[in-house]
């Protein structure tokens, strides 16, 4: 039997030692009105209306929170940083993650080497209640981020919650992204409802092995994770799921009295899409730790509401989004070694892959262009290997940015590369 090989390339470092980075978005007026959905702001000078200027009093979060996250310990209070999402962010740091903010004037891109905060540099992207529509480029960037292995946390709020008075609220903005991007219509199978609900619910899906509802596997230590038994919405919304659009989409928490295995009245949901993952939440205030911008009235939804279940849910979900779903570190290391691509960018349109593999698993390599369109797909077999190198002819591809998806068995990983003339 011909042995087929598959290889993995990594965007940042190795799987064993790569630092998981989490990016909290602040480009969509997450600090507008009475909200302060940021992790830390040293300055409060933003004016948030149809446009953003530095002539106001709202939080203006910087890229890197201060004081330094390297000094955070188990006893560090959430007031260490100044933002209503600081407790969540500090919990992420305690978990070993690095957190950053995409500031109000940052750019949401995927595969743009000119952007130091390009989404390809992060494992998880958290967007709590956007108040401005995503541009066409941003919509495609977010969907491609998930498609090629990223984890997206999309949080909405109740209908008519437009905090900057531009006619668009968060649920409309999320629905617009999912239906008008040009990568795939409704890729996640999730639609936010035009609803406004306030209630405490114990209608949690019966999914005993679900890591978002019951915490990460025993190989991952998390002191604030655990079983989720309830949630409290304080003017939030619900979702309707479409399993025809995405067969993986799953309701996790439902309105009180609703079926816990249905596709309507969903308050929290999750899905996978290609190589990535999504978690959707219908109330923007559940991460609110009650402190932040002194000009806002904030409430503790993270710990005080729902008997602490919101902290468990959000950290369970964050870890799930940040964790590779189909193969663990040991499996990667056991299957692949001495992996490299040289050169990158690719010269003469001849892609050279260097790797060693003792696996007999079926393998496949797919190339996508910058829009997410599949342009090449084939298997790697040992008869084509010479001195540990597999050469791939890319003469039929134009110069530009591409993404490679490498799959062995059920496991996969993606990386960006460039082709020069």
Explain the meaning of each model-derived region.
Residues 333-421:
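C-terminal outer-membrane/trafficking sorting elements
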Residues 92, 125, 149-152, 269, ...:
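Residue-level detector of buried hydrophobic side-chain packing
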Residues 25-28, 102-106, 127-131, 155-160, ...:
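Active-site-proximal beta-strand/loop segments in catalytic clefts of secreted hydrolases
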Residues 1-20, 329, 389-391, 412-414:
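Bacterial Sec-dependent N-terminal signal peptides
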Residues 158-263, 271:
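An acidic, glycine-rich "communication" segment
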Residues 19-28, 34-38, 218-325:
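A glycine-centered loop/beta-turn motif at secondary-structure junctions
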Residues 70-180:
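Helical hinge/lid and interdomain linker segments adjacent to catalytic or ligand-binding clefts
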Residues 18-122, 302-305, 315-323:
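Aromatic-Pro/Gly-enriched surface loop or interdomain linker
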């Amino acid at each position: 039997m011909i042995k087929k090989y598959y290889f993995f390339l990594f965007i940042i470092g190795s799987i064993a030692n790569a630092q998981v980075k989490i990016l909290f978005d602040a480009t969509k007026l997450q600090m507008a009105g009475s909200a302060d959905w940021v992790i830390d702001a040293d300055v409060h000078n933003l004016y948030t209306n149809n446009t953003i200027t530095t002539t106001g009093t709202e939080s203006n979060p910087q890229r890197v929170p201060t004081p330094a996250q390297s000094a955070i310990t188990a006893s560090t209070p959430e007031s260490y940083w100044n933002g209503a999402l600081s407790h969540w962010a500090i919990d992420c740091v305690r978990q070993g993650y690095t957190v950053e903010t995409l500031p109000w004037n940052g750019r949401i891109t995927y595969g743009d080497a000119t952007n130091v905060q390009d989404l390809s540099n992060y494992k998880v992207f958290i967007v709590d209640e956007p108040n401005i529509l995503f541009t066409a480029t941003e919509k495609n960037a977010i969907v491609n981020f998930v498609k090629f292995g990223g984890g997206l946390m999309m949080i909405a709020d109740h209908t008519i919650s437009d905090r900057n008075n531009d006619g668009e609220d968060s649920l409309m903005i999320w629905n617009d992204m999912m239906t008008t991007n040009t990568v795939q219509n409704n890729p996640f199978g999730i639609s936010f409802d035009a609803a406004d609900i306030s209630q405490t619910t114990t209608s949690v899906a019966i999914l005993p092995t679900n890591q978002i509802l019951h915490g990460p596997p025993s190989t991952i230590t998390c002191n604030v994770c655990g079983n989720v038994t309830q949630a409290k919405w304080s003017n939030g919304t619900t979702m309707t799921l479409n399993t025809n659009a995405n067969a993986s989409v799953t309701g996790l928490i439902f309105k009180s009295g609703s079926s816990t295995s249905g596709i309507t009245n969903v308050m929290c949901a999750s899905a996978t899409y290609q190589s990535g993952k999504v978690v959707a939440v219908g109330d923007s205030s559940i991460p609110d730790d009650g402190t932040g911008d002194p000009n806002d009235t904030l409430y503790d939804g993270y710990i005080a509401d729902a008997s602490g279940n919101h902290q468990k849910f959000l950290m369970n979900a964050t870890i799930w989004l940040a964790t590779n779903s189909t193969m663990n570190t040991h499996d990667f290391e056991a299957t692949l070694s001495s992996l490299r691509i040289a050169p990158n960018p690719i010269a003469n349109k001849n892609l050279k892959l260097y790797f060693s593999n003792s696996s007999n698993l079926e393998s496949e390599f797919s190339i996508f262009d910058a829009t997410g369109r599949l342009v090449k797909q084939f298997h790697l077999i040992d008869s084509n290997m010479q001195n540990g190198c597999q050469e791939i002819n890319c003469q039929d591809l134009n110069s530009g940015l591409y993404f490679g998806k490498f799959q062995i068995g059920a496991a996969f990983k993606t990386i960006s590369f460039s082709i020069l003339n």
